[in-house]
């Protein structure tokens, strides 16, 4: 089973991706991980990627697609795979299609943006230990203070409201069009991946069961 999981940052894709991969015994494939591994292994594509990264450039779609095609030929992908954070653009989706990479399911986790902002901007962290809290859903015993050490909690830069809104804006402009792309393809062609949307609001188990229902 070959799966693409879509959804905005903070929608809970990571948790659901782990659930899917465990249930179906398939690997979670991240382009970031692929790049790091290719660079470390000095593969031809890794060498090309490193040249671009060393000067602060953006990795081309050709390199990304090449890495993806290499990765899905490995033994652990024989039962399928789950793409995490890929494709990000229509160009990448078209390249997958052109190169004959079969996708069975595209699952979109939908969460209202204001809910995501509340989720992410409410996070607080104790950096030394890695403990995390939430001002609403999992508050510390004393506001702003770690339960164990009594030290101050901080809000990570990535969780600041302005940062979250900026990331959501990028997602809306760049990745959200993929939803329309896969919906349109499915409506026109029976061989297209099956697209389904899942409401990402609720308990982790509720969202998990909705995702499984789409895949079944």
Swiss-Prot record:
Region called NMP, residue ranges: 30-59
Region span, LID: 122-159
EC number: 2.7.4.3
Annotated positions binding ATP: 10-15, 123, 132-133, 202
Reactions this protein catalyses: AMP + ATP = 2 ADP
UniProt-annotated location(s): Cytoplasm
Pathway: Purine metabolism; AMP biosynthesis via salvage pathway; AMP from ADP: step 1/1
The UniProt record lists the keyword Cytoplasm: yes
Primary site of residence: cytoplasm
One matching Pfam family: ADK
Gene Ontology annotations for the cellular component aspect, listed alphabetically: cytoplasm
Gene3D superfamilies named among the record's database cross-references: P-loop containing nucleotide triphosphate hydrolases
Any one Gene Ontology BP term: AMP salvage
Binding positions (AMP): 31, 36, 57-59, 85-88, 92, 156, 167
Keywords for this protein: ATP-binding, Cytoplasm, Kinase, Nucleotide biosynthesis, Nucleotide-binding, Transferase
Enzyme class: transferase
GO molecular-function terms, A-Z: adenylate kinase activity; ATP binding
Free-text comment about domains: Consists of three domains, a large central CORE domain and two small peripheral domains, NMPbind and LID, which undergo movements during catalysis. The LID domain closes over the site of phosphoryl transfer upon ATP binding. Assembling and dissambling the active center during each catalytic cycle provides an effective means to prevent ATP hydrolysis.
Recorded family membership: Belongs to the adenylate kinase family.
Subunit structure: Monomer.
Protein's name according to its UniProt entry: Adenylate kinase
Organism: Ruthia magnifica subsp. Calyptogena magnifica
Lineage per the UniProt record: Bacteria, Pseudomonadati, Pseudomonadota, Gammaproteobacteria, Candidatus Pseudothioglobaceae
